[in-house]
Amino acid sequence: MLLDSECLVLPRVPVQLLDCYRGGGPVLGAPRRLDVFLSLLRRLEYTSTLDMRMFSTSLLKSVRLDGIEEAANAIETDFVLPFRASAFQFHKYKLLMDLFLPSQDLLDVDESLSTVEKCLLHKMVSSTVQPWERGDENVQCPLSVQQRQSMTQSNQRVRSRCPIEDGVIQTHWGTISPGTVIGAIASALESQRVSITDILKANVYKEEVSQQFMEAALEEWTKKSEHYKEDEEDSFNQVDVQSSDASINNIWVATLAGDLAEVVVNQGPRVGAFADRLMVGSNNRWNDTILPRDYYLLIQNSTTIDWHFTDAEILAGIDGLILAKYMPTWVAQRRTLRLSQVIEMYYSNEGVSFEPSVRACNRQALFQNIIDTTQLYTEASRFAHILSLRQITVYVPLEEMQRITEAAVSTFMNYVPSLLRQNHRECEVTRNVPVVDLIVATDAAWKGYDVEQFMSWIGGALEVDAQRSSIGLLHGNTGQWIVPPSSNLTGFFDQLQNSTVDWPNRLNLPNVISAVKRHSRNQTLRDIEDMSSAGHSTLALIFSPSDRPSAIELDRARDLMMSLRNSYFDVYFAYAAQDLTDFQNINNVYLDYSELFLKLPSTSVLDAITAVETHIVNSAVPMRIFGPQCPVNGTEYSQTPYEDFVIPGREQNYRIHPFYLRQQPLVTTEFRNDGQGRILVCMWRGSETSHACQTINERDSYAFNLTTPCPSPDFCPPARFVVSALSTLNLCAHKDCRLPNQVGYYIRHTGTRCLPLLGSSAHNNSLWKALVVLPLISLIELIFLEI
């Protein structure tokens, strides 16, 4: 039990979180979504040397503080911050961290995260409700005529009729409270039962409880538990509520019993031990399911608080209890397992790699196997008694507390089945996600919020952070960056929120193509400097639902496109418009199917999302394998093998463009297995239906040889490769491993043609310009989206 006062949880906003509240805090524009939450966890994990147990508890101590509310009428000054952990959620969190999960803050969050990232993570894991009226209620939760007529005026600060619930994120299987899930995992990795008599005698607990309450509680527990004993060998065993050594399990406190105790303590004394009067669950909705930022509580009575156990907390409590059962076994199997990996695997269709049946889409069955109503009643009743002494000013006798708890458990068990059905989503077969550097440009049809919606959706659909892809936003008229390419959605939206650039009033296609060309050149120069041998392809997605380029712009666009295709071979263009005629005539020379045309029925974002999901997100845009820079003045440019990973059930696609194959006697591409499982590598050329495939066992390698890959000037299809995992050993422990079941491998190639981009070698442009024009490719190469 923690007694060091310096480590205790206090209600004031800690120093490291002051930036999140001073002046109202920074604007947090990123979506409150699972993928964004995981990206922040990964950034912390990448720079941390703590194991999962220490990392989880330190995370709870450094960025979580439940129950922070703004004072009703206080004004902020240099010496007064009108925010404090004064709401009911604080008391449970303080007991959890002080008594059941004692720890120190060993994380330097500011070292890994920006202020915006830190504050977003804090808001995601800290349970509280913003209760005060904001001014947008007429839009978000309008009143009926009868309600407006019955309203009364007040000089006091008014509570909102749809307050915002913080500490929640959106997942495919319902909105959850991630702080609860982390608390469950941390408790499972440091599982303990804490004796009630020890709690009542601990200075850290009784210093804030009146002496009269303490004496009454000790007398009750001593008198009522004289004839009972308890077997505590298993933390999940059933226990009697009045045993002589009665104790409370920290896993239950962190999950369902802790939240249910809040219902008992906060509602029970007011409504009594009646199941039909106790409120469990909540009625919520997001401001926008595509760009979820605010989670509104749609309450029945703005004068009464009834959000003591919300839907998000219930789902997270169930998920946390499920994960807690398995965590010690999984960590024993893989000591390098990370918190982000466990959470991502659970909220995925594939499930946790150590136990695939453990996944959110199987939540209903898992809950039936894990829940024990007797145990829930016992743990909730005991913790409610401890919580009540700290939180309320009236002493509630133990027997009355038990009756209220029994009613609360009944209410909870009656409510949960409908909540689970409502948030159930069938497990689906996993899909491939292309790894690309995406550049988006729009015309005047879309304004600020439309663009934000689309960028939020595409960032999640492409799994930008997890897949190491990037997204950037170009000004459709000037070709300047509104937001430069980023693989961090939080940072992307921070820059977007702070941008002072006016939205485009039209599309200037030549400016957009020029910007893509500059980006491609800069990327190629970075590749040369980094000695890269493979990487992401660039995809320029141009939205022009309402605009059409002029004849002069089309001519200029054709010239720029020819220049771009002449130097940079792995750049794809996708045009989305209601009328595609003009865009289909921009590139009529380089027929390598690096263009895609998406016909939109309207200018709406939803129609654009449907088209992009069908033709791009569900496609197989390949990554690029490319040759080195040609020697310049005696300087040789070497390349290093490319490291990559594949997730079981998915594929990684690669392409060698014909330019790198031409005039070469032998091109060799070698794949070396890094030892975490077996992989299958297949190679083919153009539209060949027969693939040359090779299974590569752990630590083995295999080389694909292309002898005279281009037998004639007019016939040179690209070389394509696809990698999949046949088996996994769950050994992926590298910091770049997204999941433990990934299988790593290296790609090394020799014999490819060099790229004359730098120095005197660039003068050879005219020599190979004509060679890139492949008139017969249209007959032999499949459209990349169908591969």
Name each model feature, range by range.
Residues 1-8, 12-30, 34-68, 72-89, ...:
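MIDAS-like acidic motif and immediate structural context at the N-terminus
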Residues 452, 650-652, 656-692:
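Acidic, Ser/Thr/Pro-rich low-complexity intrinsically disordered segments
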Residues 368-438, 445-450:
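Acidic, polar low-complexity linker/tail segments
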Residues 407, 411, 546-600:
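VWA/integrin I-like adhesion module and closely mimicked acidic/polar interface patches used
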Residues 55-58, 62, 66, 71, 479-542, 547-555, 575-582, 618, ...:
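Von Willebrand factor
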Residues 754-772:
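C-terminal GPI-anchoring signal of eukaryotic secretory precursors
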Residues 120, 141-142, 147, 162-163, ...:
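C-terminal edge strands of extracellular/lumenal beta-sandwich accessory domains
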